[in-house]
Design a protein with these regions (language model features):
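Glycine-rich helix-loop "coupling/hinge" segments at transmembrane-helix boundaries
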Residues: 12, 191-214, 300-305, 473-500, ...
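Helix-loop-helix hairpin linking two adjacent transmembrane segments in secondary transporters
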Residues: 206-230
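The alpha-helix within a helix-turn-helix
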Residues: 153-154, 435
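Membrane-water interface segments at the C-terminal ends of transmembrane alpha-helices
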Residues: 1-13, 26-143, 167-192, 196, ...
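Alpha-helical transmembrane segments of integral membrane proteins
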Residues: 237-273
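A short glycine-centered flexible hinge/capping loop motif at secondary-structure junctions
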Residues: 48, 156-158, 438-440
Length: 533
């Protein structure tokens, strides 16, 4: 509301002049940036679906040796924080990346002509990074479907394509819509990929950042409102369309089992395709590790060598000697997640157990930060806390060390609240009633009955919130101060200083720590918590 107020405000009252500046055809930079953002987001949804959906069908339908390894490798993009993933693509597909250098040596052409830049580069990064949403959502839907429906259609003479179009796809539509919403909104909010790959291409998230730095706060507020409006319009449009076409399963069939591979050439083509795609999905990770061991200055933008020749561990020594940013990120993510746990569990309890009045309104308000782009959340916080108010106990938080962890808290609260709500809903009320009948008080019932049942789901959501906050970049770029520099800004700083090898070492350390969090989640909290993450 503070940003909306600022976008309409003027020295002498209310005005729409700032919106007139945004939608002006004489200076169409903002309109062009909006159109480019929508175009990039739509193309990202299409490419992510083209990658993730076939992989989900392949790995959920057939059983073959190495299938679990392929599934794990296909899911690897989720452990790459946004900035680290984009940097890995710069080293792999940028003007001086491994692939353009290799093609240049093979063809004799300029490596820059073989690089992915502009809209193609941004969409490629988004398609790779966000395909995991389509893969995860569709895989879950396929594994939970009732195969008796397709068997009944087959018994009535329906062919494969007819069964796919009339039975399977309608049942998968909620998963497809959910993944499309997340990919579109994440692409609209994406900052690092357009910043490093777009070149002269204007997108609204980068335009908002530039406007904010120039000091034009009114126009930045308008850009925030428009960016939020586009994302929310897409969200509500897809949800409305999906609700009108909702299909449910009303049978007592069993979940289908994976089929063995057919005989003949297909028996070898299917696993081969799975392994090839899996290797492609981990190429950015391997590129990041490779670059982190290269000696600084021996493989630069001006070097003609396709592959580096001098390796060292000095980059890791330098990164570890300047480990304060990583410690800052861990500390801020920890306290933000701790707050998410306390507030999120309370909200989930109110919505699922107490079923308070206007619960739908509370649920929508809680989920709003997840629907808004990170840049908009950052601008909202800067605007709201640029002066003292009751929520900050009269203190000005803008420019302080407190605003960035607050952004992590606000941004990830919906994840923990929704996981807590789902966990509470799954508890059979008769369990707590039995404990009450035996004389157990509220605290004893919660500690011995409720808490063990909700712990896996809630801790899974908390782990996801922690990992997201740990590598957050979009809000950090607007809110960080030197005293709390996060790891993402340290990586970006090394990149801007052309110390790419140290930036890669930072990235590997961050990815390794996130992988450790995933491992601890699975070992300590079980597979349910890990699946939540």
């Amino acid at each position: 509301l503070a940003v909306l107020w600022q976008s309409l405000g003027a020295a002498d009252g209310w005005t729409l002049s700032h919106y007139g500046r945004f939608f002006s055809f004489t200076s169409s930079a903002n309109l062009l940036a909006t159109w480019n953002s929508v175009l990039v987001s739509c193309l990202s949804v299409i490419l992510a679906a083209l990658i993730g959906v076939p992989l989900a069908f392949l790995l959920s339908t057939f059983d073959f040796p190495g299938r679990k390894a392929c599934s794990a490798l296909v899911s690897m993009p989720i452990v790459l924080p946004p900035l680290v993933g984009v940097l890995a693509f710069v080293f792999l597909l940028g003007e001086s990346g491994l692939v353009p250098r290799g093609l240049s040596n093979l063809t004799g052409s300029n490596s820059a002509s073989c690089a992915l830049t502009g809209i193609a580069g941004v969409v490629a990064v988004h398609g790779y990074s966000f395909s995991v949403f389509f893969f995860t959502f569709v895989s879950s839907a396929l594994e939970n479907r009732d195969t008796s429906l397709t068997e009944a259609a087959a018994s009535l003479g329906a062919g494969k394509w007819l069964r796919l179009r009339r039975v399977t796809l309608p049942l998968l539509m909620p998963a497809l819509v959910g993944a499309a919403i997340i990919v579109f909104m994440t692409s609209m909010a994406s900052f690092s990929a357009p910043l490093l790959f777009a070149g002269e291409l204007r997108v609204l998230s980068v335009q908002l950042y530039s406007t904010r730095l120039s000091g034009d706060l009114r126009l930045a507020a308008v850009q925030s409102v428009v960016l939020s409006g586009v994302s929310l319009a897409f969200l509500f449009a897809l949800r409305y369309w999906n609700n009108r076409r909702r299909v449910t399963m009303a049978t007592k069939g069993t979940r289908g089992r994976r089929r063995s591979l057919p005989r003949g050439l297909t028996r070898w083509l299917i696993p081969s395709a799975g392994f090839v795609v899996s290797v492609i999905m981990v190429l950015p990770h391997l590129t990041l590790v490779l670059l982190s061991f290269i000696k600084q200055g021996t493989w630069t933008f001006r070097s003609d060598a396709w592959f580096p020749a001098v390796f060292t561990v000095e980059n890791y020594r330098m990164a570890l000697s300047l480990a304060r940013p990583l410690a800052n990120s861990i500390q801020m993510a920890f306290f933000a997640t701790l707050g998410n746990l306390v507030v999120g569990v309370f909200i989930g309890w109110l919505l699922a157990v107490k079923r308070i009045r206007f619960g739908n309104v509370v649920d929508a308000l809680v989920m709003l930060p997840w629907a808004l782009p990170g840049t908009v959340v950052a601008v909202n916080l800067l605007t709201a806390f640029s002066t003292g108010n009751v929520f900050s106990f009269g203190q000005v938080l803008a420019g302080s060390v407190w605003l960035l962890p607050l952004a992590y808290f606000v941004r990830n609260l919906p994840v923990v609240a929704r996981s807590a709500q789902s966990a509470f809903v799954q508890i059979d009320p008769s369990l707590e009633e039995a404990a009450r009948s035996l004389g157990a008080g509220w605290w004893l019932r919660f500690r011995r009955v409720t808490l063990p049942l909700i712990a896996p789901g809630v801790l899974g959501g908390a782990m996801l919130a922690f990992v997201t906050a740990l590598g957050e970049f979009v809000a950090s770029v607007l809110l960080w101060v030197p005293a709390n520099q996060p790891i993402s800004m340290a990586i970006f700083g090394e990149y801007r200083e052309y110390r790419l090898e140290v930036a890669a070492a930072y990235g590997v350390l961050l990815v390794a720590f996130i992988g450790l969090v995933f491992f601890v989640s699975r070992v300590a909290f079980g597979s349910k918590a890990a699946s939540e993450v």
